[in-house]
């Protein structure tokens, strides 16, 4: 049994490995009926933190020095300062409830880091233990990815990288959860001498890289590049400063051989099944032609704009997802919001100001500094320095993730980050302690334990409420997304607790509840909930669209239009917002409002918006309004193959009276045509085209009739209007012109026209083409 220096039973030595394994395995906690598995994972983290706290309280006399050791370095002080500053954001946050949820999470991560540091201080062979634990976890994650790939191939014959989730919620989390563990496997390869272990561990590296090649997260490819460069630098330095042995340089094979083999297998076996890693890697660039990169750059610009305007106090921790809607409002489709800025660092700057950004960045900078000091000045063994350097490489992988994604919101990757930071801190403090004993500050122990207790107990309450909410949101969001009302009305108020007050997609929960009361026509109850919903998220305007619906159902069209206008101008790219506002403009015959909405309505050139605008405008503007005609013409240029747009253009440019009159002339012309009176048919068809010069059918009919009576020049003039100006792309007009050319004695000139007509799908052209052009 483990004993301390006094010969007494040491419970920390016994329990430290168990608790550390518990932390590191948090990523395996499943959804447990929640919308997102992070909810039960945060609960799990809180519970393990509380278990650690109970042990620390029971062993408080033995850990006095350790607590001083882990809480007094600048890294820890910066981290504590960051949490304190984040806590203050509760008082100025857009949504203080959401700030509270996120403050609770960050307090848990802080205590997890400090707890890990205390546990690692009391753990022998910590480097081996952590590396073996993470290697085993990595093997399980790889297995899950390979199972996904095999199932996809067996089911569909291809691999769908976007669906390669493994044991996590999405492929980016899976990819970085795998990549960040590779340095620990490389350390074991360096450490162990048995060839069988080296082969086993090298195989794990190969399978990890092969998994990443199938997942195809480009950011993880950059992470792999950092690992390769870092490991190469390590082996080169060891070669220069230590052995000068070729064997040292050959150690590069432990990363290069698996890498080349993974690429080869990917290209030979997997690329043809939808997961070509080389082609995917080739798309890594800063080009704005890439949709994903363009989106991230837009998010970064919004964040930096906000920081420049709010350098001290931001939106409040966890509140950028709300303010981002305001910045990105013209590009948001539906209610899919930019939930994260895809860079933890600058997002924290937007949420907590420059001070919060610098405090968080300081944690990383101090970690890098500690590694440099340890490697440069420590008298530790090459084995320990190798491990610490590889910790820095792993931290670099996390930093790439943190600059391109949002690992700060995901416990699965955060636990590894906390372990890395804790290990760096412990090794640095051990180095300092070797030169000069670290002074124990007895007062820190009761302060630390008391603050931990005061923070963690409420944290359990809040994280559990969030978990219960995410279970209830499963039902609310299923109904919301399918526009159904399966949840009974008597369960609506109790299906989720009051924390948080927005869904995982930022829709106010009270507003989602209100839709059930709107459906039940309990309007007063619904309006009260919607007022609360607006306060929870004032930028999404879902509450306003429901208020508009309520007032319209009550016959209060002006009030309905006021709220529909707010919703439309708030999120103009939302089809529900635009269609409701246009409908109310039409009902109230408000031409001024339609004119005001035009620019935003057509900004993205969406077919339905243009069509709805033209339909409503045609009833509000006078016939042949010049401005409206120009807009209708522009619509035909944007959507040249859409018959509804063409019909609306004709109706607007000619007027309904003109369209009807032309149709009447055309009908008379067809009557003459059917009895072979082509002269009178031509007269009626020409009346039709003069009345409605935008309908190509009138020109085609007139040209055909004139062709049949031998009026070839006029027929050619009329059919040229169709080809050159109206361009219906139906093949018929080219066929008619070809017949005119043949009758004029120019069959050679007719052949290109017949070729075009045949290829456009006009079947009558085939026989004529074969007769004259073969």
Predicted regions and their residues:
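Alpha-helical transmembrane segments of multi-pass inner-membrane proteins
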Residues: 2-30, 45-56, 83-90, 102-118, ...
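Register position in tetratricopeptide repeats
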Residues: 519, 553, 587, 655, ...
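Canonical tetratricopeptide repeat
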Residues: 512, 546, 580, 614-615, ...
């Amino acid at each position: 049994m483990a004993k301390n220096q006094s010969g007494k039973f040491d419970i920390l030595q016994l329990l430290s490995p168990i608790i550390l394994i518990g932390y590191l395995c948090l990523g395996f906690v499943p959804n447990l009926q929640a919308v997102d598995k992070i909810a039960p994972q945060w609960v799990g983290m809180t519970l393990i933190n509380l278990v650690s706290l109970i042990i620390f309280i029971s062993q408080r006399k033995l850990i006095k020095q350790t607590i001083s050791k882990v809480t007094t370095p600048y890294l820890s002080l910066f981290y504590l300062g960051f949490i304190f500053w984040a806590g203050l954001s509760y008082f100025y946050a857009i949504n203080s409830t959401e700030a509270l949820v996120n403050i609770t999470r960050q307090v848990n991560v802080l205590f997890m880091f400090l707890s890990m540091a205390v546990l690692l201080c009391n753990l022998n062979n910590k480097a081996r233990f952590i590396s073996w634990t993470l290697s085993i976890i990595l093997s399980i994650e790889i297995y899950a990815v390979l199972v996904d790939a095999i199932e996809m191939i067996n089911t569909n014959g291809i691999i769908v990288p976007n669906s390669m989730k493994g044991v996590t919620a999405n492929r980016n989390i899976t990819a970085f959860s795998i990549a960040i563990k590779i340095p620990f496997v490389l350390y074991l390869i360096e450490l162990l001498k048995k060839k069988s272990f080296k082969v086993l561990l090298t195989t794990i590296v190969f399978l990890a890289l092969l998994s990443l090649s199938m997942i195809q997260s480009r950011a993880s490819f950059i992470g792999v590049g950092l690992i390769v460069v870092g490991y190469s630098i390590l082996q080169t330095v060891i070669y220069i400063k230590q052995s000068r042995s070729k064997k040292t340089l050959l150690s590069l094979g432990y990363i290069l051989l698996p890498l080349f083999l993974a690429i080869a297998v990917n290209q030979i076996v997997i690329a043809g099944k939808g997961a070509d890693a080389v082609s995917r890697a080739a798309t890594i660039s800063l080009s704005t032609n890439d949709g994903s990169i363009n989106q991230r750059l837009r998010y970064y610009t919004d964040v930096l704009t906000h920081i420049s305007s709010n350098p001290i106090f931001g939106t409040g921790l966890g509140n950028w997802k709300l303010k981002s809607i305001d910045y990105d409002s013209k590009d948001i489709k539906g209610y899919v919001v930019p939930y994260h800025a895809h860079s933890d660092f600058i997002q924290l700057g937007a949420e907590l100001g420059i001070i919060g950004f610098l405090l968080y960045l300081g944690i990383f900078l101090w970690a890098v500094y500690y590694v440099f000091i340890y490697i440069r000045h420590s008298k530790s063994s090459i084995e320990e320095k190798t491990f610490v350097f590889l910790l820095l490489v792993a931290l670099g992988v996390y930093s790439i993730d943190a600059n391109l994604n949002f690992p700060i919101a995901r416990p699965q990757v955060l636990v590894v980050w906390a372990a890395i930071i804790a290990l760096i801190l412990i090794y640095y403090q051990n180095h300092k302690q070797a030169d000069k004993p670290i002074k124990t500050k007895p007062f820190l122990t009761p302060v630390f334990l008391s603050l931990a207790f005061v923070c963690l107990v409420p944290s359990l309450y809040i994280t559990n409420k969030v978990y219960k909410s995410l279970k209830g949101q499963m039902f609310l969001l299923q109904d919301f997304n399918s526009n159904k009302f399966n949840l009974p009305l008597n369960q609506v108020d109790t299906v989720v607790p009051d924390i948080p007050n927005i869904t995982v997609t930022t829709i106010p929960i009270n507003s989602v509840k209100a839709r059930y009361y709107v459906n039940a026509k309990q309007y007063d109850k619904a309006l009260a909930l919607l007022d609360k919903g607006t306060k929870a998220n004032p930028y999404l305007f879902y509450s306003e669209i429901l208020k508009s619906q309520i007032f319209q159902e009550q016959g209060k069209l002006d009030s309905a239009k006021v709220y529909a206008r707010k919703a439309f101008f708030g999120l103009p790219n939302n089809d529900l917002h635009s269609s409701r506002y246009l409908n109310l403009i039409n009902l109230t015959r408000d031409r001024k409002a339609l004119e005001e909405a035009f620019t935003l309505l057509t900004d993205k050139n969406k077919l339905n918006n243009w069509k709805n605008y033209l339909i409503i405008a045609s009833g509000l503007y006078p016939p042949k309004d010049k401005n409206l005609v120009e807009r209708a013409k522009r619509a035909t240029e944007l959507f040249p193959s859409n018959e509804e747009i063409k019909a609306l253009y004709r109706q607007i440019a000619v007027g309904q009276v003109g369209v009807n009159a032309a149709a009447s002339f055309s009908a008379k012309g067809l009557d003459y045509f059917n009895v072979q009176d082509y002269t009178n048919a031509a007269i009626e068809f020409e009346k039709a085209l003069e009345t409605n010069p935008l309908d190509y059918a009138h020109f085609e009919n007139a040209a055909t009739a004139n062709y049949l009576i031998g009026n070839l020049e006029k027929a050619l003039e009329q059919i040229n209007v169709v080809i050159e100006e109206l361009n219906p792309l139906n093949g018929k007009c080219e066929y008619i012109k070809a017949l005119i050319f043949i009758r004029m004695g120019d069959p050679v000139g007719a052949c290109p026209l017949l070729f075009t007509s045949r290829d456009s799908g006009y079947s009558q052209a085939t026989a004529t083409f074969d007769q004259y052009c073969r």
